[in-house]
């Protein structure tokens, strides 16, 4: 974990700094990283406004989503809110038997439950697994999320299992996977295009901006004044992932999937 984190920090530092100084070949850095970890690294960087691909590596290959799927999940929830099919203020109750091993926020509210908004906040900002599973139950489970993604034009991303099983990340298993290209394009649709209302787009970005888990990755190497809204993921077999919206001057300019 520590070695992979240091490699990612080095990669992201090289990617972010060029915007302010001398360009660096990101692909060369990624290939060097692959040689070091004896594994694959998928990467896509696109322009936030146009969706144009700025740089990529293995962008069409499948990689496990792990907890990064929680951004897509909350995007699906917000679409239902926009359509009047869900309310962020609706309270969902549960009991101790519903709790996953990693439930930092939901474990504190067994008595009173949590609202849909609070569950989305918990799923994204602390990666609370129980929050994610409770939210999945409101949209038809993993199949429901996959169906939603197909409706946005994403024909690659798929969710097949609940937390924590989806983090198995077994090599060659296509369950619970996406491609860097598909994830980046879907994020661009959710965060900048008309899939969500402006109010819901801002809500989703605000949850990502409050991420309390991704500090050691992007946030620790960003130049001063840059904005970031992100979500990280970790799974078995050394799998790690991050999706992020970031840019200089406090304004979003690119989407990165790694």
Show the residue positions of the predicted features.
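Short, glycine/proline-biased beta-turn/loop segments that scaffold the active-site neighborhood
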Residues: 83-108
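Conserved catalytic neighborhood of penicillin-recognizing serine enzymes
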Residues: 99-134, 142
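Active-site SXXK
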Residues: 51, 63-92, 255
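Active-site-proximal alpha-helical segments within enzyme catalytic domains
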Residues: 68-71, 174-209, 240-258
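Beta-lactamase-like hydrolase cores
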Residues: 19-64
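Mid-domain, small-residue-enriched loop/turn segments at the edges of structured enzyme/sensor domains
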Residues: 40, 120, 133-192
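Bacterial N-terminal signal peptides
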Residues: 8-15
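Short, Gly/Ser/Thr-enriched beta-strand-loop segments that form substrate-interacting elements
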Residues: 215-258
């Amino acid at each position: 974990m520590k070695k992979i984190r240091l490699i990612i920090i080095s990669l992201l530092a090289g990617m972010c700094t060029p915007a302010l100084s001398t360009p660096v070949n990101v692909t060369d850095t990624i290939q060097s990283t692959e040689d070091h970890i004896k594994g694959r690294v998928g990467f896509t960087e696109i322009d936030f406004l146009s969706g144009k691909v700025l740089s990529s590596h293995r962008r069409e290959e499948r990689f496990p989503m792990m907890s990064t799927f929680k951004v897509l999940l909350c995007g699906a929830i917000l679409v239902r809110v926009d359509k009047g099919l869900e309310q962020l203020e609706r309270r969902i109750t549960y009991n101790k038997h519903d709790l996953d091993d990693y439930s930092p926020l939901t474990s504190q509210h067994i008595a009173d439950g949590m609202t849909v908004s609070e569950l989305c906040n918990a799923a994204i900002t602390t990666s609370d697994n129980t929050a994610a599973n409770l939210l999945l139950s409101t949209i038809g489970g993993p199949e429901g999320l996959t169906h939603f993604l197909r409706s946005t034009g994403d024909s690659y991303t798929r969710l097949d299992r609940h937390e924590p099983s989806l983090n198995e990340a077994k090599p060659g298993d296509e369950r619970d996977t996406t491609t860097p290209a598909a994830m980046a394009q879907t994020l661009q649709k959710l965060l900048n295009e008309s899939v969500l209302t402006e109010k819901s787009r801002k809500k989703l970005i605000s949850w990502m901006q409050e991420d309390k888990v991704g500090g050691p990755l992007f946030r620790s190497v960003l130049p001063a004044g840059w904005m970031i809204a992100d979500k990280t993921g970790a799974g078995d077999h050394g799998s790690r992932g991050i999706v992020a919206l970031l840019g200089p001057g406090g304004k979003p300019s690119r989407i990165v999937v790694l």
